[in-house]
Amino acid sequence: DHIVGELMKGFVKKRPLPDSLVQALKEAEPQRGAELSQKLQGALPAIALTNHVALSSAFANDVDGILSYARQVNGYGNRGDVFLGISTSGNAENVMYAAVTARAKGMKIIGLTGRDGGKLGAFADISIVVPKQETYQIQELHLPVYHALCLMLEKRFYDR
């Protein structure tokens, strides 16, 4: 969820809207369009698979809870998208099912893990393994790693 926040709004840079969108907003409705064009920022599309409680609950009851993330990757993911799987051990089965679905859909897979990388580390196109064994230490090191990823993405797409 934290990563989505950094990608969907300005992280450290201002993300001005394209002129074409500013114009379209103002044409759609002058007063609200002007306000929107001043307050909205450019966004990098991102979805946290952990946030869809009703879907996850229904899918768990009707099918199999371990496949909830895979269900969402199947529904939201497209060829060329990137799936970021996070698992401290690299062996979380729900994340692995989602990664397999991502691969089948032609998505790139980044694994963010700890310990020895686990199954996800071996399966991912890009594996980032933080050098710790304890879960809390792995989680603490994941924070600067995903902040660095967000900074790099923001620089790539919003440095003008």
For each feature predicted by the language model, list its residue ranges.
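Short glycine/serine/threonine-rich phosphate/pyrophosphate-binding segments
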Residues: D1, I66, N91-A98, L120
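Glycine-rich, small/polar surface segments that engage phosphate groups of diverse ligands
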Residues: D1-Y76
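Short beta->alpha connector loops at strand-helix junctions that form conserved
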Residues: A70, S87, T113, I128-Y136
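A charged, well-structured terminal subsegment
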Residues: G75, Y136-R160
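Short, well-ordered beta-strand core segments
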Residues: F83, I109, I126-V129
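Short, glycine/polar-rich helix-capping loops at beta-to-alpha or helix-loop-helix junctions
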Residues: G111-A124
